């Protein structure tokens, strides 16, 4: 029988300790290694939110899906892959149309983005088009950019072994900050460095469960 205080219930991909120096030589994007700045967040007051998807009038999405764009669906109800589109080249109308496409397909995968190398400031600027930033108060982030939530496997093999003593799978499901009064409308997930296989992120359409 496992004692209650021994149960690991948090995400095993998110370290809760400082990154050790021997991690850095094997890390391609060292600026994104998690840090814990001593920052206090005041309660976020209610605010008016205007979804950029509602500004779209032409449902053919001409500013997003240009002649170079290729769209393929992953599942009938959820997920599409869009190739031939660079996020850094999108106009404001193109970003609105991206929001509309996300509202229809829930998850959009955009491979080979140069936004990955543009740095956290440019990435934050891009996401500001879609609404106010959300801050994760308990996870590591990028110095000077508290709106980033860093998912990092830091070689915590002992922790993972302990986790698997209590579980029959490494698959973990969660719903992002659904406890908030005004949860995020859009989330951008970028893969900086990962294994050749494994480490998959799975998405589910929770709205379908209510039909």
Sequence positions of predicted segments:
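Non-heme Fe(II) oxygenase catalytic core, chiefly the N-lobe of the double-stranded beta-helix
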Residues: 2-211
């Amino acid at each position: 029988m496992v004692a209650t205080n021994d149960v690991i219930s948090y995400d095993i991909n998110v370290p809760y300790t400082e990154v050790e120096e021997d991690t850095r030589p094997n890390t391609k994007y060292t600026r994104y290694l998690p840090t814990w700045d001593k920052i206090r967040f005041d309660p976020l007051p209610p605010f008016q939110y205007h979804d950029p998807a509602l500004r779209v009038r032409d449902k053919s999405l001409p500013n997003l899906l240009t002649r170079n764009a290729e769209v393929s669906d992953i599942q009938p109800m959820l997920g599409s892959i869009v190739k031939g589109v660079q996020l850094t080249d999108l106009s404001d109308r193109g970003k609105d149309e991206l929001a509309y496409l996300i509202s229809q397909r829930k998850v959009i995968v955009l491979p080979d983005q140069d936004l990955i190398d543009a740095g956290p400031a440019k990435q934050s600027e891009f996401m500001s088009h879609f609404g106010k930033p959300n801050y994760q108060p308990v996870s590591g982030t990028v110095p000077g950019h508290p709106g980033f939530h860093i998912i990092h496997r830091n070689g915590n093999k002992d922790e993972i072994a302990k986790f698997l003593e209590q579980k029959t799978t490494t698959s973990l499901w969660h719903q992002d900050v659904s406890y908030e009064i005004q949860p995020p409308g859009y989330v951008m997930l970028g893969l900086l460095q990962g294994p050749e296989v494994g480490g998959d992120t799975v998405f589910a359409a929770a709205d379908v469960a209510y039909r």
